[in-house]
Design a protein with these regions (language model features):
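N-terminal amphipathic/hydrophobic targeting modules at extreme N-termini
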Residues: 19-26
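N-terminal ordered "arm"
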Residues: 48-92
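Extreme N-terminal basic, low-complexity initiation segments
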Residues: 2-13
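Internal, well-folded beta-alpha domain core
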Residues: 99-225
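Short, Lys/Arg-enriched N-terminal segments with co-localized hydrophobic residues
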Residues: 28-46
Length: 225
């Protein structure tokens, strides 16, 4: 099983602004949006246009700022990370995805750049059949986009299942939960002049072209598979 005990993990949280190169907006109260559109033919299958706009959350079990951003091994010898997306507006073809959430759990022993990740996808239990299929396609990388570029790092897909996913933020405090599976709460770290501490351009970023806001968690728990 992938199990994460309570720890003082370092977490990331970013918002997206609509545009070709999104801008990090965490904590400023502005409406957030991320555009990602794919329209192409791959392996004989016509890929639908899709767009998701909203907030991104991430938490892991490392006890320092995520070592993977400089290709270093995790502080505990293994990384257990949960990535989550809060879709404020979105669609996949004609299927509306607004108001739904998705999460991806990843487990890697040793350096994350070496691959062999074990991953599991969690799809908002409020999604109907068409919405669940669309979310699964987008956040597994099957619909194209940046997540498809990370697919070679995955060694095993443990499964995909519906779940109640809660994602909350007020710009300074953040919380993530997958009912009965995962929970984390964290706050931003104040930098020079009271500004946010941010990291941008790291090679394993699940969303390129934006700055990640660094925070420290009060707790991180994960137990599934």
């Amino acid at each position: 099983k992938i199990r994460g005990k309570q720890s003082a993990s370092v977490c990331l949280a970013i918002d997206y602004k609509k545009g070709d190169r999104p801008i990090a907006l965490v904590g400023n109260g502005l409406r957030t949006c991320r555009r990602a559109t794919v329209s192409r033919i791959q392996r004989g299958i016509v890929m639908s246009d899709w767009k998701v706009a909203g907030k991104y959350f991430e938490a892991c079990n490392c006890e320092a700022i995520c070592p993977c951003i400089v290709f270093s091994p995790p502080t505990t010898g293994e990384c257990i990370a949960v990535l989550a997306w809060q879709i404020e507006e979105g669609h996949h073809g004609d299927t509306d995805l607004s108001g739904l959430n998705a999460a991806l759990a990843a487990h890697a022993v040793g350096n994350m750049k070496d691959g062999n990740w074990r991953v599991a996808l969690y799809i908002d239990s409020d999604a109907d059949e068409a919405q669940a299929s669309a979310i699964g396609a987008i956040f597994s990388g099957q619909a194209g986009g940046h997540l498809e570029n990370l697919a070679p790092l995955i060694g095993e897909v443990l499964g995909a299942k519906p779940a109640s996913i809660s994602l909350k933020s007020d710009g300074k405090r953040f919380s993530m939960s997958i009912d009965g599976i995962m929970s984390s709460e964290y706050g931003s770290i104040e930098g020079q002049g009271g500004g946010d501490v941010e990291v941008s351009g790291h090679p394993l970023a699940p969303v390129p072209g934006v700055a990640f806001k660094i925070g420290r968690s009060d707790q991180f728990k994960f137990n599934d598979y």
